[in-house]
């Protein structure tokens, strides 16, 4: 089996006219598409969901699907199939999404509503133990004393998959920029598995399918360890990953050395994309075959970035891990 997959255009022509949004290839890669909601769509969406504060979406989970339907209806029901087609397409699987008119931290609640609507057109966002909600908001500042690299600004946050230390399947990851002050650097880093030049070597290694222990630090509010291999396959036999260097716990010398070499091979890949994400925009990626991370920031005493994330499962597909769910 050849683990590399050629890049093909989306079955829906990226030059096609859509109702309520536009779609173009990104400057970084044809695998990453940029979807922009028009000013009119954004305005109508916010007007129609204004009656529900974010707290209502937190307390009544069915409302998350309601706001998704409102957004899809405003896009002539072209949005949901486009999202699913793109995210389930192995040759793509990633979107940078923007809504004209949403670009300021004062609109943070509107950002949460928009991201929630998009996410719940493809599936459902899982409970986030770190925040106690279906989403998490967190801040990166110039000085950090936390117990993981999530908020540390002056180093690269290495490429990884989300959901490695929980039992729930994590098919997608959504990462939104809510605020940014005195920032230079800190671009999102992305790597598609099929663009990783060392994939075949590590996917075929005897340790690739050995269950390993993943344990989270206290800030994640997850006390139970989980066991799964770093690599698995989807229903078509293609490689997928569940990996993060911070939380995998090698049991012996052999595993430790292999994981260290794996980490180096990922971080030095020539296939890594550097993607700026302005305030109000968000990345939505297939977590099974995209790794994500963050570049370092330039130090500044008043540095501040606020992010929002959602992670969940696809409700319209069965592209899950085949052997260790």
UniProtKB/Swiss-Prot annotation:
For this protein, the record's Pfam families field holds:
CsiD (PF08943)
Specify the pathway: Amino-acid degradation
Q: Look up the coiled coil feature and give its residue ranges.
A: none
| GO BP | L-lysine catabolic process
Q: Which reaction does it catalyse?
A: glutarate + 2-oxoglutarate + O2 = (S)-2-hydroxyglutarate + succinate + CO2
In the UniProt record, does the keyword Metal-binding occur?
yes
Residues bound to Fe cation: 160, 162, 292
Cofactor binding, note field = Binds 1 Fe(2+) ion per subunit.
Cite the entry's keywords alphabetically.
Answer: Dioxygenase, Iron, Metal-binding, Oxidoreductase
**Which purpose does this protein serve, as stated in its record?**
Acts as an alpha-ketoglutarate-dependent dioxygenase catalyzing hydroxylation of glutarate (GA) to L-2-hydroxyglutarate (L2HG). Functions in a L-lysine degradation pathway that proceeds via cadaverine, glutarate and L-2-hydroxyglutarate.
Task: Supply the HAMAP family for this chain.
Answer: glutarate_hydroxylase
Q: What is this protein called?
A: Glutarate 2-hydroxylase
- Naturally occurring in which organism (per UniProt): Escherichia coli (strain 55989 / EAEC)
Supply the source organism's classification. Bacteria, Pseudomonadati, Pseudomonadota, Gammaproteobacteria, Enterobacterales
């Amino acid at each position: 089996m050849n683990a590399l997959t050629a890049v093909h255009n989306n079955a829906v022509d990226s030059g096609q006219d859509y109702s309520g949004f536009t779609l173009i290839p990104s400057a970084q890669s044809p695998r990453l598409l940029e979807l922009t909601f028009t000013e009119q769509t954004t305005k109508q969406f916010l007007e129609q969901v204004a009656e529900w504060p974010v707290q209502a979406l937190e307390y009544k989970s069915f409302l998350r699907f309601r706001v998704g339907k409102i957004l899809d209806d405003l896009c002539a029901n072209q949005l949901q199939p486009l999202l699913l087609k793109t995210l389930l397409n192995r040759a793509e699987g990633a979107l940078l999404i923007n809504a004209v008119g949403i670009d300021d931290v004062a609109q943070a609640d509107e950002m949460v509503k928009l991201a929630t609507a998009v996410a719940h057109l493809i599936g459902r966002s899982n409970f986030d133990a770190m925040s106690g909600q279906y989403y998490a908001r967190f801040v990166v500042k110039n000085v950090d004393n936390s117990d993981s690299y999530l908020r540390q600004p002056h180093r690269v946050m290495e490429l990884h998959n989300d959901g490695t230390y929980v039992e729930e399947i994590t098919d997608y990851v959504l990462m939104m920029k809510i605020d940014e002050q005195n920032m230079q650097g800190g671009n999102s880093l992305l790597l598609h598995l099929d663009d990783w030049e060392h994939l075949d070597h590590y996917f075929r290694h005897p340790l690739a399918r050995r269950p390993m222990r993943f344990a989270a630090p206290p800030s994640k509010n997850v006390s139970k360890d989980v066991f799964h291999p770093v690599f698995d396959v989807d229903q078509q036999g293609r490689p997928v990953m569940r990996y993060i260097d911070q939380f995998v716990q090698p049991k012996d010398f052999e595993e430790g050395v292999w994981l260290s070499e794996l980490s180096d091979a990922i971080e030095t890949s020539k296939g890594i994309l550097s993607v700026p994400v302005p305030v109000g925009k968000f990345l939505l990626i297939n977590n099974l075959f995209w790794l994500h991370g963050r570049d370092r920031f330039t130090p500044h005493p008043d540095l501040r970035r606020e992010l929002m994330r959602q992670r969940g499962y696809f409700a319209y597909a069965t592209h899950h891990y085949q052997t260790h769910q």
